[in-house]
Design a protein with these regions (language model features):
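Histidine-anchored nucleotide/phosphate-binding helix
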Residues: 1-18
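Short beta-alpha junction loops
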Residues: 20-26
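Short beta-strand/turn micro-motifs composed of small residues
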Residues: 18-20, 122
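C-terminal functional extensions of proteins
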Residues: 30-32, 38-163
């Protein structure tokens, strides 16, 4: 899963918001289940995961730096037009969005553009999609990083500043 990646981000001092479905879909974890799993992992593994989840003055973390929010969705894909208020608020001023899984990263958001950098990670579990998307085969992995260019930031800023 994504937990080792999360731990590495936390080690580097990154605040991490994990997003999961509000309702069950296929074999995907829900936000409530994810919260419980993180608590169990923190108790078992301790260290940075426990400090990040609960805050730890000894580790220099006065407040938690690992959060779980609900996407507001209930399917294997994520429709960002129907994001929960909690997700919208947690997304303000983020530096990176990571979409993981074929439904979220490929089916619904492969060409989505964000106002921050984005990383899309998936294993392709459909032969037709693998061929069409990357001239690949089933079970090939997709890693797509889209950086927001400085020029785009300047364009957004100058457009917003104009009356």
């Amino acid at each position: 899963g994504v937990l080792p990646f999360v731990v590495e981000l936390l080690r580097r001092g990154t605040e991490v918001v994990l997003v999961a479905n509000a309702l069950p879909a296929l074999n995907d974890v829900t936000a409530d289940e994810l919260s419980s799993l993180l608590e169990r992992a923190a108790e078992t593994c301790g260290g940075i995961l426990k400090s990040a989840l609960y805050g730890d003055e000894g580790q220099g973390l006065k407040t938690p730096s690992l959060y779980v929010v609900s996407s507001g969705n209930g399917g294997p894909c994520i429709d960002l037009r129907r994001a929960s208020r909690e997700l919208i608020e947690a997304s303000l001023n983020v530096d990176l969005v990571v979409l993981e899984g074929m439904g979220r990263a490929v089916h619904t958001n492969y060409n989505a553009e964000f106002v921050c950098d984005s990383l899309k990670l998936a294993m392709i579990k459909n032969a037709r999609l693998a061929e069409r998307l990357c001239q690949g085969e089933m079970f090939d992995c997709v890693v797509r990083f889209d950086a927001v260019s400085t020029r785009d930031d300047e364009t957004l800023t100058s457009s917003a500043e104009k009356p």
